[in-house]
Amino acid sequence: MEEVNLIVMIEVMPGKRGTQLDAYKRLKPLVESEPGCLKYELFCDAADENKFVLIEKWASQAALDAHDISEHMLAADALNPTFRAGPARVIKMASVKA
């Protein structure tokens, strides 16, 4: 099985940075306890406090698929439009072998 790497680019509405951070803090332990989660880490743009990048690494596509339909992710997805400036941009990355 090949690992799945995601870069998720997120922009929140002005004044909603704290809501994004609270959501991440709540979700992080739940996501990291999921089978196949290898990394789930949020970074903020140093120049724009409303922009974030979430780095995810999954052991397999099946693990990511299960994550996407987990109860906590479905609940989070329902709330995202209340504080995000638009849909997240998800980039699926392949590892480069040297």
Which residues make up each language-model segment?
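Glycine-rich beta-strand-turn "strand-cap" elements at beta-sheet edges
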Residues: 2-4, 41-50, 76-98
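Short, flexible segments with low predicted structural confidence
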Residues: 2-4, 19, 35-37
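Short, well-ordered beta-strand segments in beta-rich or mixed alpha/beta enzyme
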Residues: 4-11, 41-68
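Short flexible/disordered coil segments
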Residues: 8, 70-71, 96-98
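Short, surface-exposed ligand-recognition loops at beta-strand->loop->(often short) alpha-helix junctions
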Residues: 11-20
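An amphipathic, aromatic/His-enriched active-site/gating alpha helix that lines ligand/cofactor pockets
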Residues: 26-39, 57-91
